[in-house]
Structures are given as C-alpha cells and as structure tokens.
Design a protein with these regions (language model features):
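Positions in alpha-helical segments
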Residues: 105, 180-181, 219
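Hydrophobic residues in alpha-helical segments
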Residues: 28-31, 119, 159, 186, ...
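Conserved catalytic cores of soluble enzyme domains
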Residues: 37-41, 45-62, 66-77, 81-152
C-alpha cells in the first residue's frame, strides 16, 4: 500500500546465487530441542503467497543457486529472469522432507511428467529447463540448452503411475540408461518423502491456485519435519555430512498407503 513503491526487484547477494533455501539445520535443532517451528513456516509460506498476490511488479533475478526457499521468493514473482548460470532444484526428498513453498504448483503443471521427475529426484536443472518447468519466464541467451525435453519419452512413460512402486519399477526396467539412473537417485531418497511427494503432486491439478498448494504444504510440513527421516536426512547431508542416511523405510515398496494418507 506504500505509494512510494512502484515495483520490487529481488537480487541475490554474492556470486554463489540468489538463495539456497531455508536453514534446515536450525529447523532440525529446533525439533530436537522441542521448540516450536510452526511460526517459521507460517511466515515463510505467508511471504510466498504475498509475493504471488502482490499487485505491483515483482521482478526476480534468478542467478546461480536458486533452490528450495529461494524458489519460493522468486518463482511466484510477476517476472522471473534466469541467468545463464541459474541452478534450480527442490531437493527436499534428499533430506526427508517434501518440495514446498508452493513450487509444486508449477511442477505439477509442467509439460508431461517432467515436474514429477524433478520433484522426486531432487535433480538440479538449468535456466532453460527452469523456463520449461514454469519456474522462470526468460532464460539468458547464453544459457546452455535444457535436457528435460530430450528426456520426455522415458519420463512420460515412467512417471505417470499413481503408485511410487510402479514408478520405480518402470524406471528400473526401462531400456534408456537415463531412466535407470533416475531410479537410482530416487532409491537414495527418503522412501516416505518420495511417496508423500508423489501423492502431493498428483493432488495439485485439482487445486485452484498457489494458495491451495501452500495450504497443503503447511499441513505436510507439520507431518514431515517431526519425522525421523527429516532429522536423519539433515544429519546425513548437512550436519555429519556422511551422506549415508538410515531412512525409516528400507525401500519405497515398504511405505504403506495408510502412511501416505496420514500426511
């Protein structure tokens, strides 16, 4: 409502990138200490919705690392410009969480099942694939070619199933080695996170907008952040950095439908 503000320009500080996301180590410690973490998500998701609904121009310059919460504060802008070195990702399944900050709205509406591939694997993509996924409007002309479109044949054939076990089976049995490599990535992620993410992504097309997606994200955050997988995933990736998490389930096939629906 400030008449002195005509528009907003979001820039990252430093050369590494716009934003690598939330301080999940601090969130993990809050859980371990028994402290409330709800206010953090209320503020973060509230900001994401404010950006999406902001009535004035909001331009985000997405350079370098633009992941997790970094996408939350940039992908919802009215103009998103990806630099040649932009690196987009929602890597939450790697740490026992789920893609949030409303970004699954874009991933679920991306061509074919490309968004599902990125959500389940946590894969990093460049500027042109960011445009394909709906995370950016324009890519710098110097940006390298994207890869997702060239992978559409096996992505669309394998990620179309509603059961994560069927997705994995399709990837592992596909003739294309890139499909089998994607299966290996998913096998290394939290099985519970993968199953919950797949279900959440499939619900998005029934929603009316980002506000609905953020409401779903808020419910999932309460369930997932207190789970053993989040505690263990952050430990393995960011605390001890041994990269050998011991998930609550050995395999995706071990996650029950009841466990997914409980989230």
């Amino acid at each position: 409502d400030d008449e002195g503000v005509d528009s907003v320009l979001l820039l990252g500080e430093g050369s590494r990138g716009l934003c690598a996301g939330a301080d999940v180590r601090a969130l993990r410690q809050a859980v371990l200490d028994g402290r409330d973490f709800g206010e953090f998500f209320d503020l973060e998701y509230g900001l994401d919705l404010l950006i999406k609904e902001y009535p004035k121009p909001y331009e985000a310059r997405q350079h370098g690392i633009t992941m997790g919460g970094g996408l939350g504060i940039s992908a919802h802008g009215s103009r998103r410009l990806a630099s040649a070195d932009a690196a987009f990702a929602m890597p939450e399944t790697i740490i026992g969480f789920t893609p949030d900050v409303g970004v699954t709205w874009y991933l679920a509406h991306a061509p074919g099942w490309t968004g599902m591939h990125v959500a389940l694997t946590g894969a990093t993509v460049g500027a042109r694939d960011g445009v394909l996924l709906g995370l950016a409007d324009e890519a710098d002309e110097a940006a390298p070619a994207g890869e997702l479109e060239d992978n559409r044949s096996w992505i669309d054939a394998c990620y179309c199933f509603p059961d994560p076990s069927d997705v994995i089976a399709a990837l592992e049995s596909h003739a294309d080695s890139r499909a089998r490599a994607a299966a290996a990535l998913i096998r290394a992620r939290s099985p519970l996170s993968v199953a919950v993410t797949l279900e959440a992504m499939r619900r998005v097309p029934t929603m009316t907008g980002v506000a609905d997606v953020l409401a779903q994200d808020r419910v999932l955050a309460d369930h997932m952040i207190g789970s053993p997988d989040f505690i263990e995933g952050v430990r393995a990736q960011l605390v001890d950095k041994d990269r050998t998490p011991r998930w609550s389930h050995d395999r995706i096939e071990d996650v029950t439908r009841a466990e997914v629906e409980a989230c």
